[in-house]
A protein has these predicted regions:
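Short, small-residue-biased leader/transition segments that mark boundaries at the very start
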Residues: 1-6
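Carbohydrate-binding/catalytic loop surfaces
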Residues: 10, 44-59, 85-103, 143-172, ...
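Structural helix-adjacent loops and short alpha-helical linkers that scaffold large soluble proteins
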Residues: 10-24, 54-67, 115-128, 188-201, ...
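Long, well-ordered core segments of solenoidal/helical folds
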Residues: 18-37, 66-85, 126-144, 152-163, ...
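CBM-like carbohydrate-recognition segments
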Residues: 61-64, 228-241, 246-247, 253-329
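Aromatic- and glycine-enriched pocket-lining scaffold segments that form the walls
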Residues: 83-146
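Oxyanion-binding "anion nests"
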Residues: 176-212
Length: 329
């Protein structure tokens, strides 16, 4: 699982083959997931494991599950709606027909990379179309994102816009904003389409204005309990990784420094005693104080796997970008 991805990230940073061997030992336990067409997170799961494994090692054994899973994921796309369906379930009291969540942007890296690897333009087209449709429908005028947009599968019409895991439908759920920043930064990096860079910069500008002084967002920017509410370390880690990338991609010199400075601030705070657990504590996770879904009372103020993953990813990117190692000084 993602625990093995951590080992691969540590290998990438240190060059210690022990960690590479530990990661490879268990990666193929995820092999059956390649056919799991009922889960929109398939791209996220396979890119973080098999995708990273191939990127780092170049070994051919990782290619088949990458291609198969990408094509299975593309099967969740509808040309009528122009997006990949997220959830197959309907919650009590909700009348969703074709729900799409902002988190789904994180699956596009797997699709686009597979399209490049295998010369499969259909996969790239699905990724681009999903990103374009989401850009049109998920965002408010202030560049904050809804969590969920529900479409009519018959004609593609937007039926409703909600924020299921946030404070209210019109609130800015922190991790949703992180997925949005990361997703459009990533799509520009892969495709070179300027509209994605513009969107990423607009989202980044909104975040720079609204983030607390230490860089760690409250679980929802519009919670009515600020400043006494919970922070979300996972959102900060995702943002930090995206901010590092965006600092290298932007054409605006004045913004480059602002993005990198925010990433460094977030990483320093996450690496402080307030968020970084001591060895052997916190269930052996790195980061404390993430929030899964406050409205569902699920994963409240706990460690989360993807918080650790993006924290390590952000540290690696920061190290490459600045040729330094972050510390607490």
């Amino acid at each position: 699982g993602l625990g093995d991805v951590y080992k691969r990230q540590i290998y990438e940073y240190t060059g210690d083959k022990t960690f590479r061997e530990l990661a490879e030992k268990n990666t193929f336990k995820l092999y059956p997931l390649k056919q799991k067409g009922t889960d929109h997170d398939l791209g996220f799961q396979m890119n973080c494991s098999f995708g990273n494994a191939y990127r780092i090692t170049g070994e051919q054994k990782y290619l088949e599950p990458i291609h198969t899973s990408a094509r299975v994921l593309a099967g969740r796309f509808s040309p009528v709606t122009g997006v990949i369906r997220s959830w197959d379930f309907v919650r009590k009291g909700r009348d969703w027909k074709y729900p799409v969540i902002i988190d789904n942007m994180m699956n596009l890296e797997h699709l686009y990379n597979a399209g490049l690897l295998f010369g499969d333009d259909t996969l790239k087209s699905v990724a681009v179309t999903h990103a374009n449709t989401t850009l049109c429908n998920h965002f408010r005028p202030d560049f904050t994102s809804y969590h969920l947009v529900d479409y009519d599968p018959a004609d593609g019409r937007v039926r409703r816009k909600e924020t299921v895991q946030g404070f209210s439908d019109e609130s800015a759920w922190a991790r949703g904003q992180a997925w949005a920043l990361y997703g459009y930064t990533m799509m520009f990096r892969l495709s070179g389409y300027e509209c994605y860079l513009n969107q990423a910069e607009n989202i980044a500008g909104m975040l720079l204005e609204r983030l607390p002084d230490d860089g760690i967002p409250y679980w929802d920017f519009d919670s009515d309990r600020i400043p006494d509410d919970l922070r979300d370390a996972s959102a900060a880690a995702i943002m930090a990784s995206a901010f590092v990338d965006l600092s290298s991609l932007t054409n605006k010199p004045e913004e480059k420094g602002r993005y990198l400075k925010m990433a460094e601030k977030q990483l320093r705070t996450l690496a402080s005693d307030a968020y970084l657990a001591r060895p052997g504590e916190n269930g052996n996770f790195l980061l404390m104080h993430s929030v899964g879904s406050r409205p569902d009372n699920h994963e409240i103020d706990v460690p989360l796997t993807y918080a650790d993953y993006y924290f390590l990813e952000a540290l690696l990117k920061y190290s490459r970008t600045t040729q330094t190692k972050p510390n607490n000084n």
